[in-house]
From Swiss-Prot:
Subunit record text: Homodimer.
Record organism: Streptomyces coelicolor (strain ATCC BAA-471 / A3(2) / M145)
A Gene Ontology biological process term: L-leucine biosynthetic process
Gene name tied to this protein: leuA
One Gene Ontology cellular component annotation held by this UniProt entry: cytoplasm
Annotated binding of Mg(2+), by residue: 46, 253, 255, 289
Entry cofactors: Mg(2+)
Disulfide bond positions: none
Primary residence: cytoplasm
GO-annotated molecular function: 2-isopropylmalate synthase activity; acetyl-CoA C-acetyltransferase activity; magnesium ion binding
Cytoplasm is among the record's keywords: yes
SMART domains reported for this sequence: LeuA_dimer
Keyword field contains DNA damage: no
Protein name in UniProt: 2-isopropylmalate synthase
Length: 573
């Protein structure tokens, strides 16, 4: 059938296509990725510089600690010569004992100016492992428009910068620092391949890589300009033509201007790249850097260990959202609120049958479901492997962006809300922000939470307030609860029996006309030690309403009763 599309009015003549690479015997299409690459996170540099409101020192530290916890061994921590804030952050993590694990290398970026190089190297004094990353733009438009220099002029910038890095490293860094060097011909994707090779060779001639003296050559798609296949061709060509290849770590740094950064990174690995630089969830300039989470989880979904821990993907997201003051899209691969949810009835039916088939297969083999190969329609991985459950995600299939609120409550107030309670509370915050506009501060979030869930002794509300209670257990294991209470303003004593204090309290509430059914109950300690308090969360059906309540007390039984009162009072508020 003929293509009926018509020419558009857009000025396509303004643009030219990308250059093809003359490499007829390319080998990368026949390769497979069977091991994880070296990873470098540049969230604290490339990611941070792209934020409207760059991270505060506290948020930077939270991001650094997250990256370390996840298992990243190379972390670009800033551009210390760009300002005092970045310099001070680098110094703070170096000077704090134990902040940087012994097997983690920090990296810092610099341009090829002597004053900047000196300041950059100075920031690394005392570091156990450190890399200086020097870059200069090499593409024709930069040579012509920005620097107004020849090829030789641009190459000399790279050579002189490399020499200065070596000199200042020898002058300022002691023997306790395991020093590394990285060079990037910025705008590699727009640079002629022969010139990119010429510059890299000149840099290596200066640095003299060899046994025990690696050089990292990073070939950035500073702006993504071609298909991933052409990007792979460029990497294979460079890998074939670089001298001293055995002493070179060939690194890829894709951006997502064409929306294919993940594919470009994966094909570059197939073409011989050793290392990938990127950011969690694709944060970065313009359309972002390549997404390290998607790359790692793509490996995981193919049975390849990414050597990064994504087992609590929502905790990673909460911290990321707090640090970046941004939200992860609900359709973001592997982590978005909707990615394990199917709205189509036929999809849901296929998923259910897939679960049933796996359970039957596991039973027939005499093993658990976790011991057999994952095979469920529409679910590329088992959501449980990243801390999710299919049922829980279904409950939030129209929600997004709740991680930041949960992060504030957990980190500021030690409250780890159950997932469904997060959803319930986030609706209250959303209503407040819709009504008032603008940002909502952590203090305001806590004020809303207290007013909604926790009793205010200065301004009590709700049908019920409880005071002292006592539980006894008979020989049959039945608990009887007696509790002093105020119901509708009148003091009374409530008495009920059941299988445990909560069941007994539900029975007692029936005596004052309140019918409560338990749907879910969770609890955790908020701290350690003799004065530790417990937080109890209870989901109740009260009439035709389903609501959560919370109770906080040093005694877990009292905390659970307070949680019931919280839910009941909310239902009648």
């Amino acid at each position: 059938m003929a293509n009926r599309q018509q020419p558009s009015p857009m000025p396509t003549a303004k643009y030219r296509g990308y250059d093809q690479v003359d490499i007829a015997d390319r080998t990368w299409p026949n390769q497979r990725i069977t091991t994880a690459p070296r990873w470098l996170s540049t969230d604290l540099r490339d990611g941070n510089q792209a934020l409207i409101d760059p991270m505060s020192p506290v948020r930077k530290r939270a991001m650094f600690d997250l990256l370390v916890k996840m298992g990243y061994k190379e972390i670009e921590v800033g551009f210390p010569a760009s300002g005092q804030t970045d310099f001070d952050f680098v110094r703070s993590i170096i000077e704090e004992p134990g902040a940087i694990p012994d097997d983690v290398t920090i990296s810092v970026l610099t341009q090829a100016r002597e004053d900047l190089i000196e300041r950059t190297v100075e920031s690394l004094k005392g570091a156990r492992r450190a890399t200086v990353h020097l870059y200069n733009a090499t593409a024709p438009v930069f040579r012509r428009v920005v620097f107004r220099g020849s090829r030789d002029d641009i190459k000399q910038i790279a050579v002189d910068g490399t020499r200065l890095v070596m000199e200042y490293a020898e002058k300022l860094l002691g023997p306790e620092t395991e020093f590394g060097y990285q060079y990037s011909p910025e705008i590699f994707t727009d640079t002629e391949l022969d010139f990119a090779l010429e510059v890299c060779e000149a840099v290596m001639d200066t640095y003299q890589p060899g046994p025990g003296r690696e050089i990292i050559l990073n070939l950035p798609a500073t702006v993504e300009r071609s298909t991933p296949s052409t990007h792979a061709d460029r990497f294979e060509w460079m890998g074939r033509n670089l001298s001293r290849r055995e002493h070179v770590c060939l690194s890829v740094h894709p951006h997502n201007d064409r929306g294919t950064a993940v594919a470009a990174a994966e094909l570059a690995l197939m073409a011989g790249a050793d290392r990938i630089e990127g950011c969690l969830f694709g944060q970065g300039e313009r359309t972002g850097n390549v997404d390290l989470v998607t790359l790692g989880m793509n490996l995981f979904s193919q049975g390849v260990d990414p050597q990064i821990d994504f087992s609590d993907i929502d905790e990673i997201r909460r911290t990321w959202e707090y640090c970046n003051q941004m939200e992860v899209h609900p359709r973001h691969p592997y982590v978005g609120d909707l990615v394990y949810t199917s709205f189509s009835g036929s999809h849901q039916d296929a998923i259910k049958k897939g679960f049933d088939a796996m359970e039957a297969d596991a039973a027939a083999r005499g093993v658990t479901v976790d011991d057999i190969e994952w095979a469920v329609p529409y679910l590329p991985i088992d959501p449980k492997d990243v801390g999710r459950s299919y049922e829980a995600v279904i409950r939030v299939n129209s929600q997004s962006g709740k991680g930041g609120i949960a992060y504030v409550l957990k980190n500021d107030h030690s409250l780890d809300l159950p997932r469904r309670m997060q959803i319930e509370f986030s609706k209250l915050i959303q209503a407040k922000t819709d009504a008032e506009g603008g940002e909502i501060t952590p203090t305001a979030i806590w004020d809303v939470f207290q007013d909604e869930y926790l009793p205010n002794p200065d301004n009590p509300w709700g049908r019920i307030q409880v005071a002292n209670g006592q539980t006894t257990t008979d020989r049959d294991g039945v608990d009887t609860l007696t509790v002093d209470a105020t119901v509708d303003g009148a003091e009374t004593t409530l008495v009920g029996s059941g299988n445990g204090p909560i069941s007994a309290f539900f029975h007692a509430l029936q005596g004052v006309g309140i019918d409560v059914r338990l749907l879910d109950y969770q609890e955790h300690t908020m701290s350690e030690g003799a004065s530790a308090q417990a937080a109890s969360y209870i989901e109740c059906a009260i009439g035709d309403k389903v609501l959560w309540g919370i109770g906080i007390d040093a005694n877990t039984t009292r905390a659970s009763l307070k949680a019931v009162v919280s839910a009941v009072n909310r239902a009648t508020r």
